[in-house]
Amino acid sequence: MKFHLISLGCAKNLVDSEVVLGCLRDAGWEMTDEQDADLLLVNTCGFIQPAVEEAVEEILALVDIKADFPEKKIVVLGCLVQRYKEQLLESLPEVDLFVGTEGVANIAEYVGKLIAGEEQDKVIMPTEFLMTAKVPRQQSTPFFRAWVKITEGCDNRCSYCMIPSIRGPLRSRSVADVLEEVQAMVASGVQEISLIAQDLTAYGDDLGDDVNLLVLLKELLAKTSVPWIRLLYLYPSELLDELLQLMAANPRIVKYLDIPIQHVNDRVLHLMNRPYGRADLEEFVDKARAHMPDIALRTTFLVGFPGETEEEYAEIGEFLRVRKLDHVGVFPYSNEEGAPSEHFPDQVDDEIKESRCARLLELQQELSTEIQKKYVGTVQKVLVEGVSEETDLLLEGRTQYQAADVDGRVYINEGQVVAGEIVDILITDSQQYDLVGGVVSVE
């Protein structure tokens, strides 16, 4: 039997999709294109309305295929099911099976029954799955880099966010289990692991006082040889002081942090139910650069939050002009059904939200152009990704200061190297987000 899988949403969702791939592979299924497949699956995102709309469009595209080939089966998985199961069941009768976020590890059993015509519920909603190293998983990223999801769920209660109600409470994997998975990845040739969670700094909060992110990192440093360890999605917290010290002392933890701060105005942050203020953010950025002057910092901002004034919005631009963060994403606020902020007064007009978003992105583009110039004339370690997406005449890769999929890249215009190598590159030019350089040496 053959299947086709579409994966939507974030890296954490992609790990779930890789579990689906691994489970179906082990059950004897073969992956193919949507026309040749007996089974059509889509792992959905339901975090924000644009993601919901994208997921529905993908499902309807599969429904169109099934209209021409009614023998095909459609399975919808993930966050959209978790959030809107009743509405989906009513509005999409063409879908044969709906599976919530916690059902990915049992997908082979569910689709086996579906294909065999055995009786089972049309909507399957298991509770509180936790990834382990023993769960089958087929890596879909290039062989030299992988995502490692160290928690499920979230205990933070941001007023605009539905993740806790979709993904459930925080559940942390054991240190030994994460270590086992990373050791297997290194043995298969992985050069870079990116630790991911809704909030990495919350790792271990449910496991007792002796387990936290620092403990995990020290074990990974001591018991694996992975060259690059990247940390994505952290909260400003008390843990960060010690984390910065550990990063500064261990070059295998790349000098890069992704901390989605969302805003800098104290009143807006309070309304968002974020547990820090502008002074905390400024202190963290200054501390990070005191420990590691070359650290790259990424963040995201949410503009147009209910009640946000033009003056409060302008504080973000002031913050960026002074602190000059390396990588910035900006998103317009959208009301999410069931989130507390849905009912907040003084909702901001969509046109104003889009304008604020565009202006902030334009500012960051100007700042980024200047920030990138500091790399020109330096030699940087670059993880080679392969032939450039822009032209077959160039190779491309990333420095430790660039995360996959979201940041810029290094275009390699001189020298012969292969994907998966970490090489020394002399940076000769910079662009708005990208760098250009040639090979100096290969590790």
From Swiss-Prot:
Gene3D superfamilies: Methylthiotransferase, N-terminal domain (3.40.50.12160), Nucleic acid-binding proteins (2.40.50.140), tm_1862 like domain (3.80.30.20). Keywords: 4Fe-4S, Cytoplasm, Iron, Iron-sulfur, Metal-binding, S-adenosyl-L-methionine, Transferase. Its EC number is 2.8.4.4. One of its GO terms (biological process) is tRNA modification. GO terms for molecular function: 4 iron, 4 sulfur cluster binding; aspartic acid methylthiotransferase activity; metal ion binding; protein methylthiotransferase activity. Its cofactor is [4Fe-4S] cluster. Binds 2 [4Fe-4S] clusters. One cluster is coordinated with 3 cysteines and an exchangeable S-adenosyl-L-methionine. InterPro entries: Elp3/MiaA/NifB-like_rSAM (IPR006638), Methylthiotransferase (IPR005839), Methylthiotransferase_CS (IPR020612), Methylthiotransferase_N (IPR013848), Methylthiotransferase_N_sf (IPR038135), NA-bd_OB-fold (IPR012340), Ribosomal_uS12_MeSTrfase_RimO (IPR005840), rSAM (IPR007197). GO terms for cellular component: cytosol. It is found in: Cytoplasm. [4Fe-4S] cluster 1 binds at residues 10, 45, 79. It comes from the Bacteria. Residues 373-441 form the TRAM domain. It catalyses: L-aspartate(89)-[ribosomal protein uS12]-hydrogen + (sulfur carrier)-SH + AH2 + 2 S-adenosyl-L-methionine = 3-methylsulfanyl-L-aspartate(89)-[ribosomal protein uS12]-hydrogen + (sulfur carrier)-H + 5'-deoxyadenosine + L-methionine + A + S-adenosyl-L-homocysteine + 2 H(+). Residues 1-116 form the MTTase N-terminal domain. [4Fe-4S] cluster 2 binds at residues 154, 158, 161. Belongs to the methylthiotransferase family. RimO subfamily. Catalyzes the methylthiolation of an aspartic acid residue of ribosomal protein uS12. This is Ribosomal protein uS12 methylthiotransferase RimO. It comes from Desulfotalea psychrophila (strain LSv54 / DSM 12343). The gene is rimO.
